[in-house]
Amino acid sequence: MEEEMMILGVDGGSTKTLAIVFDERSERIMGVGISGPSNFTNAPRETAESNISDAVRKACSEAGTDLDGIGIRVFGLAGIGDSREATELGKDIVRSIVGHADVYSDGLGAYKFANLNDDGVVFAPGTGSVGFIKNGSDPERFGGWGWFIGDEASASWMAKQAILFAEREHDGIAETGFLDVVRRYFGMDLYETVYAISKEKIAKRVVAALAPQVSAMARSGNRYAISIFEESSSYIADLLNAKSRIFGRSGKYSVLGGTMLAGDFYRDMIRKKSSVDVSIYYGYQVAIGDVLIGIEKKGSISVDLRNKMIDQLNSILENKKEDIKKFLFLDSVPTS
């Protein structure tokens, strides 16, 4: 394969790193690599480097190529844009692994994936949460205040709500059903858990990984778990409705992130409460946006091409059961 036809797109965040090698000539994803977190602002540089390198190596190996065979390399990393220092650190990490590359905020890839070049809003509730609005220029960020006070509707926020309900059950205020769930998940007394989290002895991504159990409880009818999703969906609808007034209800509105895997019940809540049409995607698909940025360096992109890549990625991931369970917390790839 000719070098100029190969594109590497990498999305790195607080929970996982996913790399895609795409052949522009055949319009096919040739390789996919998944590894652990690469948000260098809340993990050691060595961890971020190792996981980015691992994901890239896996994707290249599956594609039957190496970095010399890839002409365009686009990285979308959490932490880029947080500060000048963070941005330089992220770019330096990428250079140390692949040499020349275009490095952007993971939000730019997320926006490109969901809305392409249309004006509108993308809200991304994953491990944390952040939003982007585009109105005739480059997407601008909003939200993303961090998990101590902000990151509403994110997996870490949902996990914190679950711990709060566990505290209420512990204190005899309400039988929420969360106390045993939280104890089993963290493997320690509730007081010890709260102390460890407050002292940052338990990583944000580990706390956030409790969210799938909250989803399962909601699907089984636990009213306290359902209330978490009611509050979360109301927040998402409120922000979409508020931002839509800027566009006079026109524009494109998308929500993407791992929390969208909670189930149809949650996606339906968001759509019913929103006054605009909402497209919903999943966080593991965002690396496609980085590939689309690469394609635009020489050509054009379309919804049809994006959707074709989604189908290809889903098909490839179905054959990576161990990786999607370990890094994406999925037993299978969603079909809707």
From Swiss-Prot:
Keywords: ATP-binding, Kinase, Nucleotide-binding, Transferase. It catalyses: 2-dehydro-3-deoxy-D-gluconate + ATP = 2-dehydro-3-deoxy-6-phospho-D-gluconate + ADP + H(+). It comes from the Archaea. One of its GO terms (molecular function) is 2-dehydro-3-deoxygluconokinase activity. Optimum temperature is 70 degrees Celsius. Disulfide bonds: none annotated. Optimum pH is 4.0-5.0. Its EC number is 2.7.1.45. ATP binds at residues 15, 127, 208. Pfam families: BcrAD_BadFG (PF01869). CDD domains: ASKHA_NBD_KdgK-like (cd24083). Probably activated by phosphorylation and inhibited by dephosphorylation. Belongs to the eukaryotic-type N-acetylglucosamine kinase family. Catalyzes the phosphorylation of 2-keto-3-deoxygluconate (KDG) to produce 2-keto-3-deoxy-6-phosphogluconate (KDPG). Is specific for KDG. PANTHER family: N-ACETYL-D-GLUCOSAMINE KINASE. Homooctamer. This is 2-dehydro-3-deoxygluconokinase.
